[in-house]
Every structure is written in C-alpha cells, then in structure tokens.
C-alpha cells in the first residue's frame, strides 16, 4: 500500500476494497488487512470513516499523521465497551465539595507557577496513598507527578531513553498508548511473548540479546487487554534479568483499582524500576492526576523533564487531589469503585460464561477469545452494526506482531443496567452465529 500510494499507482481519492474482499483477493487473513489499513491511516496514507470506507489520502507528511484517538468519543446511541471508564459512585459531588471547601479556606495564591513547596502536600499525599507495601520505603521526594498515567509514562521514557534509535521492550499485546508513546519518542518497539504468568523471562532475555533495549515497559498487576497478572516469582525473574542487562523497568499500574498483596517491581529492584499509576480508573478521570515513584536517585532528573515539558500540574489540581487523598475521600471512592466493578464483572461472566472469557473481579474489562468462525476485526465490525463498540485484539497488537482471535470488552458502569445486560446478551447471541465464510 505504502509503495503503491507513494509511486502514484494508487491515486488520491481511490477507494480501497473492504477488508474481507481484499483479504480474499490476496489470500491472507482479514485481521492482517485490517492492521495494514490501520497502520496506513496512522501514517496518513489513507483516510477512513465508519460507513464511508477507506480512501487513499495521497502523500503523507512524515511525523504529521493523526492516529486514532486514545480517548474514545462516546456516541449517545451506541453502547461503548471500548474504554474502561470510571463508574459513577458519587465522586462528582465529593469533588465539587472539595473544590468549594478549598475556595473558602485556602490561603496561598493561585497567581504564580507551582513550586516545590506548593507541590509538596500532593506529593506527600500520593506517597501515603501508594504505601510502602507496594513499592518499598519511599519519601515524598521520590514521587514525580504528571498529567495522568499516559503522560507520566512518556515522562519516564523521556528520562531514561537515549541515542538515535532507542529500544523499548513491552508485552506482545499492549495498550495502544504504548505504540503512541514509542512513535512520539522515535523509539523501536519490540514485543515479548507472554504466557499465563506474564512476560516469559526466556523470551525477554532472547529479545535483550537480539535487540538490546534500554527499558522494559509492562503492566505486571493488570495487563490490558488479557487481564493477566504477573506472578511474584516471575517478577523476581524479570528483576534479575534487568540487573543482568542494566535494563530500566517502567511498570504501568493504571488499571489496578485494588490494594494488591504482592510488591511492585519498584520494591524488588528500587535502583532501576519505575512505578506509575493515576487516579483515573479508581477515583476520577477528569482530574488528570498521575504519579511516578522513580528509581533511587532519578526523581530529580524526572522532575527536570516534567518542568521542561509542561512546568508541572496546575496548582488547583494539586490542591484538590491532595485533599481527596489525605482526607480519606479518595480511598472511600476507590472502595465503592471496586465494589461496582465486581458487580459489572459478575454480570459479564453470567452473560458470557459459556464462552472462553478471561476475567478478574477487580479488573474493569474481560478478554473474550472468539469461537471458530469469528476474527477480532470481523466481530468488532459486526458489533458496530448493532451499535455496540468493542476493541478487537488487532488494536493491541504491535506493528509487526500477530493478533489472536479475541476482543476486549470494557465494563461500562455508566449506562443503565438494562442496556448493559441487553448488550451482553446480544454479544452472546452473535458469538453463537459466526459468519459463513471461508477461513483463510
């Protein structure tokens, strides 16, 4: 596609065949064609639209392609199970009350830039919120704050990556934000094979020997999209390999809404591991409050990166989040969110229990392996026709990686129970009736 478009063989405005038609013509899987179309769109070579098709966009300007949005726009007439949105448990009223209390009682000025003194209460509250059981003993000075987990991950990558073509290692299926971050930083992204316990140490070592690598970016507690949890033994093996190969580790814990018993990698190798999370999935996405516990001796460097990038979080956000965390309101909200998510998971498992579903009661999405006859992209397209939006495995595959026949269903807690249950029932009906088509 790239060569044909750039040579002029395919002219601007030419409509490309539908995915399944082109797959049939070429004798390849629809998933492969769908990924090629998606990558071409990210490079600006083609333009796509629901119900419109895929058209040649002409010559792309390198570096200026507009990729798919990470935050999905919710359509009022559709049931959106693409993004794991924080359930409404009354936090809106709590946050409004905190804002009102701060407006009445705060003494410092909102005129100047935030500084180390005005940031300290939020850093201290975040350190206490994370706790020593998760990341080992830390002080507020070990905490660096960012605008949500995604931006905080990018900040950590900016701190540790160097050279003209840095290498990031990650899981073979990864949250799309990982691809966006790697592209933004002009880094090579290498996928590492996983099993039921997480990233395989033998495959990680093989990748390190073959490609090198400055950083391993992973989600050890809650992997998106598969719900996999990396065992403690496996985490210890990964930490040992990181020491052997002088590898930095960035653990993205943004999907964890509970208080896990096992330590994060930051506790196992504090000299080289970053722990990153946010309040997005457990309290509120609107606050855009992320935080990193940096490896020993690297917090000041990360703060310099943050200051160079965006000067720091707005002081009102710092004050609101510090109050939510220190007052106990954030913990009360988190516990309510955890209970609501468990209810949503129970409903999903009851509706889809006869299918191959991976789930955990504390994870706001399930991983559905499709029965024979369905592929991720075709099932997602069929769901879209029913006004149900889901994410196919193709959206989590790395550019050169393979995608299993599976989809991720985020458990949207902000629609009525009747609509939610109806959507799950419809999904189960569709799974039982795959399309009658040739399986390449």
Regions found by a protein language model. Give the residues of each.
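Conserved core of the PLP fold type I
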Residues: 109-245, 256-274, 432-439
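Hydrophobic residues in well-ordered beta-strands that form the structural core
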Residues: 170, 191, 249-251, 321, ...
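Short Gly/Ser/Thr- and Asp/Glu-enriched loop/turn motifs at secondary-structure junctions
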Residues: 51, 139-140, 359-365
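N-terminal basic, amphipathic alpha-helical segments
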Residues: 1-102, 108-112, 122-124, 303, ...
């Amino acid at each position: 596609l790239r060569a044909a478009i750039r040579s002029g063989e395919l002219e601007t405005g030419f409509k490309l065949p539908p995915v399944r038609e082109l797959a049939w013509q070429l004798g390849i899987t629809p998933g492969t064609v769908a990924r090629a179309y998606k990558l071409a769109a990210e490079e600006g070579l083609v333009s796509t639209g629901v119900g419109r098709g895929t058209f040649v966009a002409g010559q792309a300007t390198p570096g200026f392609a507009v990729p798919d949005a990470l935050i999905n726009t919710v359509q009022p007439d559709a049931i959106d199970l693409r993004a794991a949105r924080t359930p409404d448990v009354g936090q809106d009223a709590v946050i409004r009350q905190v804002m009102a209390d701060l407006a009445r009682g705060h003494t410092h000025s909102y005129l100047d830039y935030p500084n180390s003194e005005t940031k300290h209460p939020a850093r201290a509250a975040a350190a206490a919120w994370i706790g020593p059981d998760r990341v080992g003993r830390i002080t507020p000075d070990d905490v660096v704050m960012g605008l949500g987990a995604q931006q905080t991950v990018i900040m950590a990558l900016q701190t540790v990556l160097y050279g003209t073509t840095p290498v990031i290692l990650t899981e073979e299926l990864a949250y799309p934000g990982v691809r966006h971050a790697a592209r933004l930083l002009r880094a090579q992204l290498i996928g590492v094979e996983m099993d039921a316990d997480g990233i395989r140490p033998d495959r990680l070592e093989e990748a390190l020997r073959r490609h090198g690598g400055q950083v391993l970016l992973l989600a050890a507690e809650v992997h998106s999209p598969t719900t996999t949890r990396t065992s403690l033994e496996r985490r210890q093996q990964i930490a040992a390999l990181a020491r052997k190969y002088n590898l930095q580790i960035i653990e993205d814990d943004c999907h964890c809404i509970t208080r896990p018993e096992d330590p994060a990698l930051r506790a196992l190798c504090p000299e080289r591991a970053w722990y990153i999370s946010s309040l997005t999935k457990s309290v509120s996405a609107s606050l855009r409050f992320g935080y990193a516990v940096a490896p020993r001796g690297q917090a000041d460097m990360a703060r310099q990166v943050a200051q160079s990038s965006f000067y720091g979080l707005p002081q009102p956000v710092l004050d609101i989040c510090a109050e939510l965390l220190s007052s106990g309101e954030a913990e009360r909200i988190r516990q309510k969110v955890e209970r609501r998510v468990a209810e949503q998971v129970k409903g999903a498992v009851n509706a889809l229990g006869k299918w191959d579903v991976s789930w955990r009661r504390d994870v706001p999405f399930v991983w559905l392996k499709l029965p024979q006859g369905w592929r991720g992209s075709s099932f997602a397209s069929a769901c879209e026709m029913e006004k149900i939006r889901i994410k196919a495995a193709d959206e989590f595959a790395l550019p050169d990686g393979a995608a299993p026949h599976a989809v991720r269903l985020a458990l949207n807690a902000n629609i009525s129970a009747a609509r939610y249950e109806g959507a799950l029932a419809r999904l189960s009906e569709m799974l039982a009736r795959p399309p009658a088509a040739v399986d390449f």
